[in-house]
Amino acid sequence: MNLKEVFDFYKGKNVLVTGHTGFKGTWLSRILVNAGANVTGYSLNPPTDPALFDMAGLDGKMNSVIGDIRDLVHLKQVFEETKPEIVLHLAAQPIVRDSYKDPVYTYETNVMGTVNLLECVRLAQQQGNAPRSVLNVTTDKVYHNNEWAWGYRENEPLDGFDPYSNSKSCSELATHSYINSFFADKAVAISTARAGNVIGGGDFANDRIIPDCVRAMAAGRKIGVRNPYSTRPYQHVLEPLAAYLLIAQRQYEDNRYAGYYNVGPDECGCVTTGTLVDLFCQAWGDGAAWENRAEA
């Protein structure tokens, strides 16, 4: 990706980022601010303590709106006030295990939150203020799991198993419905992006492999790994963000780029979780070790 080209494109544009206080959302907001975009964020308060958002130097450099993606009235107000040209939808309940604890909240946030956002786009179109480019960020877990050895193409059936994955499958289907029902002329270019497991600086969330490794080392205990033999498409956080920015840019410039995108490493770049933790232990040194805590 040509970073200068991306920065030149986003400079001065009105961009709405939902979920801007989260891990990906903070990094994305920081990049857009650096590019000179007029950034509005809409999100709950930072989900962790400490929080990357509080460390990122964004105070006073963007319009940070604290709100719930389930609140259609508030979200609609933000659309009307900011008139975004580009919308990057990252707001979500992103943790698989939390989706088992509270599936209703997960579906409300990940499905109805997406519907609310798309409804705001539809209403903005009626008023002549529609954004030109909208990207719904989902996950590579939206696909029906066929237990095969190769990757999934964008046209594979969507049928996530657990509440988180399934809610993201539903988010995709809601997006498809809105595209076909209200934006078939592609006056608003809408895409979805399906990225896998992300690592990188500033991630303090629970049930994330690298933060869990660091917490274990800080506590002087072995790292517990639940699925050490599962292969995952781990990627650095800046890699999918670069893809999101490029997709949003390209479809803004040419609506033929609107579609559904897998975002991840080549097959040779995918490793098992155990291999990743081995690499972490080698880098950490000082007797770092892990143990298999596979869940029944």
Predicted feature residues:
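N-terminal Rossmann-like NAD(P)+-binding domain of SDR-like oxidoreductases, especially those catalyzing
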Residues: 1-195, 282
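C-terminal substrate-binding subdomain of Rossmann-fold SDR/epimerase-dehydratase oxidoreductases
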Residues: 34-37, 67, 197, 217-296
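Residue-level signal for the nucleotide or nucleotide-sugar donor/cofactor binding architecture
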Residues: 70, 101, 109-112, 162, ...
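C-terminal structured domain segments across diverse proteins
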Residues: 156, 174, 190, 195, ...
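Flexible loop/cap residues within protein kinase catalytic domains
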Residues: 200
